[in-house]
């Protein structure tokens, strides 16, 4: 496995500037990405904070027993009881089969940084993945993309949801899930690994009742030897650990919103467009009754916290009582989730994708509201996988993988199409037919002059010659078409693999396509990539 690094700009301007150091870190973050002492200084800060470490470890141990988690994982959970222990954390929604590749890349970055900093700092550093199980946008996680019948297709798990349930509560039907997995894996093609892959996924389903269960079961098995720990943010059993901070968020809901809006204005002044959509009356919490998750806002006129439809209307006191007695009725939004993470976990660093980097910059002042400090934000591994056969295609069309990532493929393809469309066959054969007709005409006239009875013969001879030219033209056209089909398929394969539907590979394809092709140690090999969080895009030749 060969790795080449290229400086590919992030999808958002702020993230791109943060990664390169062009963004003034003090304007949006707690630490500069280039600060070599950031982790050591962050550790000193964490040692001044207190956490409910035993409550957290007790909860996590109970949760992980459901999945028969590895000894390495259970040992890492136990490390959290140590007052000196810290975590490297990153998170994502619970995509089926883990969703796009970037989720796996994020986990790899978490694990690698945890191992690295444990050696450097001499304290226990636990790799933890925050599963966004409280998210209710199931359409973002209910599918994977495959190549089927020569097209990129979205294969959706056939659930029927009428309400905005949390992903942690969305059930998986075993029969439907088995059929869905079989269809997906079938598109990958039969290999020596296929039966092992199907058995692996079936075993994961054995431990799963919901979307989040299935996600957790998969990643805990894939990264069992690395001791990965997961935290399901949609689990009702974690809410008692959060109740005190829910109360703080309710009590200071106006301040939270004001701090975000003020920071957004500060970023606009620097030339950066905010990503978080937040209304002046936002409460930044969701109410959840087990079926419907609805965002709350504060109605100044009535003094009530309401949802959009008005079916929920609570006084501040009622909401505080709910946080204490029934914390499972509350969940965080994009603003408060990072704060709750900071409250629960002694976070040494947060592993972020480009979008997260950009929106976390909008939260700097909110952390300060609660006496918190934003942890160092580290870019996740960004990578593009290139197979040997695909590299051959790239050579044939005269491009490097980096050219495709930087947007050159379309221009080269259009040049090829233009050259193909102007192939001179039609013009050449039209001229040849005219020239042959002009050359044959005097011969016909001479034959008829010698013997008028030869008129039919010379005419037939002319037709035979033209028919042979027509046959040659058709033969060359078929050969040209065949040649172009071969070339066209090269462009198609390159585009489909590296920029499917015009999107980055890591945002479309699923890791199990590659596992089916290269084996389960493929993930282990990816985990060995050097400097996964240095902000450089990795082109991985496999």
From Swiss-Prot:
Family of this protein: Belongs to the BshC family.
One GO MF term on file is:
ligase activity
- Could you tell me the keywords of this UniProt record? Coiled coil, Ligase
Q: What is the purpose of this protein?
A: Involved in bacillithiol (BSH) biosynthesis. May catalyze the last step of the pathway, the addition of cysteine to glucosamine malate (GlcN-Mal) to generate BSH.
Tagged with keyword Coiled coil: yes
> Which residues lie in coiled coils?
458-487
This protein's name:
Putative cysteine ligase BshC
Q: Which organism is it from?
A: Geobacillus thermodenitrificans (strain NG80-2)
Which EC number(s) does UniProt give?
6.-.-.-
A Pfam entry, by short name: CC_BshC
NCBIfam families (alphabetical): thiol_BshC
